[in-house]
UniProtKB/Swiss-Prot annotation:
Organism: Escherichia coli (strain K12)
Official protein name in the record: Uroporphyrinogen decarboxylase
One GO cellular component term noted in the UniProt record for this chain: cytosol
Key words of the record: Cytoplasm, Decarboxylase, Lyase, Porphyrin biosynthesis
HAMAP family membership: URO_D (MF_00218)
Membrane-crossing segments per the record: none
Summary of the function given for this chain in its UniProt record: Catalyzes the decarboxylation of four acetate groups of uroporphyrinogen-III to yield coproporphyrinogen-III.
One GO term (biological process): heme B biosynthetic process
CDD domains named in the record: URO-D (cd00717)
Enzyme class at the top of the EC tree: lyase
Length: 354
């Protein structure tokens, strides 16, 4: 077993005792940091940054040099899997990700390959191995993937969407085609996450960014069902240590009980869910991650500290809380405010772990 100097994040996910509440930030390696912007400029564009193991490692480590974070998260993108399926990912200025050949019907789905994670996605595994080597056991490394439903939204819509009418049309008019796509994605994601674990990821997270746009019944059938399949297929132990799995559905606060039934170790919460309520509902089954509104980082330091204190008090005493934002950090947040946030979590949480 590789020695970890700080395993607080892994312990909290497994609801084991910790000295203070661990903290990391979604998108902690990102555009709010001037050093990230410099490295991205050096890479040329976003996907070149993802595909260069040394540079992906550099941006993964940048926030850890600034803040006493309790975990590193692989620098990559959820769209690596659809890209490896040959959909032609590109980024349009101001528009975000686009695909040159979106999936429109069952025939398109049938043509999609299941990517080999050490081949088409080998650059991700190289990044994982490089980051693990450079972390030198300081903190654990989190691997991740998008959920099948969330990946499918981009693949069918051809990019980002506000109303999701194209994929919902497929869901209601041709559900078989969508289920075939989701099934292929679930297999691909399982292979992808297991390859990340074998390459050195010590925990994994499934981001279901768009699960919250579904009705409860559709969420069960088209999103949660496939995440459950992935959880069932994941390696749960590696290098002599349990590999915790976190599920995060943005806008999924009303479905926590069903999510906790999947056998995952933790649930991510967005900022619209009350953490005290979430703990009452599922805290005996899973750890909870979250859940400060990322926009709170625009507030003055004293207000940020007050919000941290409120969320810590909401969760209360005992184990099973990983502090995070309720979604990714915004790109124009002052880096010092992120520092205030991280420091406040450690300082103010000590009383809850005595």
């Amino acid at each position: 077993m590789t020695e970890l100097k700080n395993d607080r994040y892994l312990r909290a996910l497994l609801r084991q005792p910790v000295d203070v509440t661990p903290v990391w930030m979604m998108r902690q390696a990102g555009r709010y940091l001037p050093e990230y912007k410099a490295t991205r400029a050096q890479a040329g564009d976003f996907m070149s940054l993802c595909k260069n193991a040394e540079l992906a490692c550099e941006v993964t480590l940048q926030p850890l040099r600034r803040y006493p974070l309790d975990a590193a998260i692989l620098f990559s993108d959820i769209l690596t899997v659809p890209d490896a399926m040959g959909l032609g990912l590109y980024f349009e200025a101001g528009e975000g990700p686009r695909f040159t050949s979106p999936v429109t019907c069952k025939a398109d789905v049938d043509k999609l390959p299941i990517p080999d994670p050490e081949d088409e996605l080998g650059y991700v595994m190289n990044a994982v191995r490089t980051i693990r080597r450079e972390l030198k056991g300081e903190v654990p490394l989190i691997g991740f993937s998008g959920s099948p439903w969330t990946l499918a939204t981009y693949m069918v819509e051809g990019g980002s969407s506000k109303a999701f009418t194209v994929i919902k049309k497929m869901m209601y008019a041709d559900p078989q085609a969508l289920h075939a796509l989701l099934d292929k994605l679930a297999k691909s994601v399982t292979l992808y996450l297991n390859a990340q674990i074998k390459a050195g990821a010590q925990a994994v997270m499934i981001f279901d960014t768009w699960g919250g746009v579904l009705t409860g019944r559709d969420y069960q059938q088209f999103s949660l069902y496939y995440m459950h399949k992935i959880v069932d297929g994941l390696l749960r132990e590696n290098d002599g240590r349990r590999v915790p799995v976190t599920l995060f559905t943005k806008g999924g606060g009303q479905w926590l009980e069903a999510m906790a039934e999947t056998g995952c170790d933790a649930l991510g919460l967005d900022w619209t869910t009350d953490i005290a309520d979430a703990r009452r509902r599922v805290g005996n089954k899973v750890a909870l991650q979250g859940n400060m509104d990322p926009s709170m980082l625009y507030a003055p330091p004293a207000r940020i500290e007050e919000e941290v204190a409120t969320i810590l008090a909401g969760f209360g005493h005992g184990e099973g809380h990983v502090f995070n934002l309720g979604h990714g950090i915004h790109q124009d947040v002052p880096p010092e405010h992120a520092g205030v946030f991280v420091e406040a979590v450690h300082r103010l949480s000590e009383q809850y772990h005595r």
